[in-house]
Design a protein with these regions (language model features):
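Active-site bordering "gate/hinge" segments
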Residues: 1-194
Length: 195
């Protein structure tokens, strides 16, 4: 155990930047104002700015222990577009471990507004088999569904849609999923886990 602890890379999971409630309020107002500057955006449904600092203590039954600090900064806004009696809403959100990596309030607000405007005039299409391009915002939901489906308990209980796919390829060759817990400043990054 002590050998492992001697070779820990610094994954930069903790930013000790301190943010006051007033600064968070100002960020929320800025991201909202940026969304409202987009032509066709009539209101913002909500804007948020937050930061958190955490201290994690990790202990296993075999005596291994480790502790580390982590941080998170985030901003988000939801914008409502209106044109010719049609209303649409969309949002943007960004979070980062380090404040310096957080996208600007202007960028987040403008993207939320632009996304809402782009939805105006959208319509439902007929059902059918067709190529689909997913917005990167849903990648986490897709991956979460997959992880739930490949979990041992789900497969053993027979409730997984992949229960009969053991040993079979389930994705196209072009789709690659990497599990790398040591990405610098990554949300899922950590030096140790419970296994």
């Amino acid at each position: 155990t002590s050998k492992l602890k001697k070779h820990n890379p610094d994954l930069q999971l903790y930013d000790n930047t301190s943010i006051t409630p007033e600064e968070l309020k100002e960020r929320a107002l800025e991201v909202e104002a940026s969304a409202l500057k987009i032509k066709g955006i009539h209101q913002a449904e909500g804007a948020n700015a937050s930061h958190a600092h955490s201290e994690i203590f990790f202990q296993t039954s075999n005596g291994f222990s480790y502790e580390w600090m982590s941080s998170r900064h985030s901003i988000s806004v939801s914008a409502i577009a209106e044109l010719n009696g049609s209303m649409e809403r969309d949002y943007d959100y960004h979070s980062a471990r380090w404040l310096e990596d957080l996208r600007s309030t202007q960028e987040v607000g403008q993207l939320a507004g632009s996304r809402a405007i782009a939805r105006i005039g959208s319509r439902q299409i007929k059902s059918g088999a067709m190529p689909v391009i997913f917005d990167k915002r849903i990648s986490n939901a897709l991956l979460s569904a997959l992880l739930g489906a490949i979990s041992g308990p789900s497969v053993a209980r027979g409730v997984s849609f992949l229960k009969d796919k053991l040993g079979l390829q389930i994705f196209d060759d072009k789709i690659q999923i990497f599990d790398d817990p040591q990405i610098m400043r990554g949300y899922g990054s950590r030096l140790y886990d419970g296994e």
